[in-house]
């Protein structure tokens, strides 16, 4: 009996989603803020982040310590 109930509920959900989508597609919708400016806001935010991190990485003078090769000399081994 459980699979039968589960199948019936799935069909109800699919039909209600399809009806909702059909209902929404018939309505004329005016573009909202995200439709008008969403891509521009996303692009400007990405550009701002890239420019800021590029400046920080190249101009601020942070010592990143990427590789110690050539800068570190090994110590002599001491036998105790």
From Swiss-Prot:
This is Cytochrome c oxidase subunit 7B, mitochondrial. The gene is COX7B. The chain crosses the membrane at residues 33-59. Component of the cytochrome c oxidase (complex IV, CIV), a multisubunit enzyme composed of 14 subunits. The complex is composed of a catalytic core of 3 subunits MT-CO1, MT-CO2 and MT-CO3, encoded in the mitochondrial DNA, and 11 supernumerary subunits COX4I, COX5A, COX5B, COX6A, COX6B, COX6C, COX7A, COX7B, COX7C, COX8 and NDUFA4, which are encoded in the nuclear genome. Belongs to the cytochrome c oxidase VIIb family. Signal peptide: none annotated. It comes from Pongo abelii (Sumatran orangutan). InterPro entries: Cyt_c_oxidase_suVIIB, Cyt_c_oxidase_suVIIB_dom_sf. GO terms for cellular component: mitochondrial inner membrane; respiratory chain complex IV. It is found in: Mitochondrion inner membrane. It is a single-pass membrane protein. Component of the cytochrome c oxidase, the last enzyme in the mitochondrial electron transport chain which drives oxidative phosphorylation. The respiratory chain contains 3 multisubunit complexes succinate dehydrogenase (complex II, CII), ubiquinol-cytochrome c oxidoreductase (cytochrome b-c1 complex, complex III, CIII) and cytochrome c oxidase (complex IV, CIV), that cooperate to transfer electrons derived from NADH and succinate to molecular oxygen, creating an electrochemical gradient over the inner membrane that drives transmembrane transport and the ATP synthase. It holds the Pfam family COX7B. Residues 60-80 are mitochondrial intermembrane. Pathway: Energy metabolism; oxidative phosphorylation. Residues 1-24 form a transit peptide. Keywords: Membrane, Mitochondrion, Mitochondrion inner membrane, Transit peptide, Transmembrane, Transmembrane helix. One of its GO terms (biological process) is mitochondrial electron transport, cytochrome c to oxygen. Residues 25-32 are mitochondrial matrix.
